[in-house]
Amino acid sequence: MKKISFILMLVALTILCPSLTFAQLQHSEAFKAKYKLKELVILSRHNIRSPISANGSTLGKMTPHQWTNWSAAGSELTLRGGVLETEMGQFFRKWTIDEGLFKDNYVPNIDEVNLYANSMQRCIATAQYFSSGFMPVANLRINHRYVPSKMDPIFFPRITKNSEAFRTEAMKQINEMGGKDGLVGINKDLKDSYAIISKVLDMKESDAYKKGEIKDFVDNDTKIIFELNQEPSMKGSLKTANSASDAFILQYYEEPDAMKAAFGHKLSLDEWTKIAKIKDVYGDVLFTAPIVAVNVAHPLLQYMYDELNTDSRKFTFLCGHDSNIASVDAALGVEEYSLPNSIEKKTPIGSKLVFEKWVDNAGKTYVAVNLVYQSTDQLKQMSLLDLQHAPQVYSLKLKGLTQNADGLYSFEDVNNRFMQALRAYDEIK
């Protein structure tokens, strides 16, 4: 009876979540007989960091409470983040060995493996921890351009074309996210999230609120700013709430006591998800409008295209930020998605956009596109990962492209999609 119930549960999950494949990276023997893994290109978000600003900043003034005593300096990778990333590296080690891409304890030559991180401490450290789990005896070099911490142009999601025509089209596309009410509509959709985060902050009890320095979150004060050679930015309630959302998410992962993480409030998982929604929306607004995405992601798209087309390469690990994954996804036309088992629904901490190159017995090359991430429970519990206890895997769909019966895109189609995104940048006036 238990076995039948389990099978029925799996069937139900397949029907309700057709895009979710819990074991996408572990293939059947029939699949393995048909395809061989040739290469992986991974774009990773750094793992858990401390907030960029906390006590003493605007973020600190928003609440009468003290934020967590972090195990790292501001914006740097925490001890927990290092452990979690090592576990993810160990999982990819087990999987690539199982698929025959590498042998156990393999030491690659300089052309086979490329680990490249943005020159921010949290990115370099994430790549270092990943490499320790992935190839523990290989002493892999982490490539980064500058002494920490400085943004590398490859990973810097900045506007490099900023004409009036660009700004007009960008704002048109951003406003469409909010329907007929535009930016106001985007903020209206966050009404519940704003209410919850204000309550958890006990914002009205803060000295800054009582002095009028901090105000209630409203729906009509968001302003988007585009400046040449700078990241898209904003002013207003959404920006202010995002800084608190970011800090709460990190504090929830870092602090074992969920009530302590919520400053003594008992929150449901749904309420934590609504807090995280603010950050998800903030990222969407700034980085996923199509014309903005192809603008800010252009250098990274070119680099990833080159890696996918380097014959000697077997494994590429690029470590950047949530804005990198969000903009690359949008530029490539990834269909809208919402991740299960995570309070962050788009680009969870430590998540990885994975392009898998497979070659069939006839020599034809295919690509699978997945988002690999640790569930909220796995992050909080620091669960060990292996082939029997895998991270979450979500199959991403590319608009207008057709997968074969095995869920793979033709390599030509994926290459062409990269080229379309690169040409779209050239077409910005």
Placement of each model-derived feature along the sequence:
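Bacterial N-terminal signal peptides that target proteins for export
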Residues: 1-9
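Bacterial N-terminal signal peptides
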Residues: 8-18
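Signature for phosphate-centric chemistry
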Residues: 24-112, 118-316, 320-429
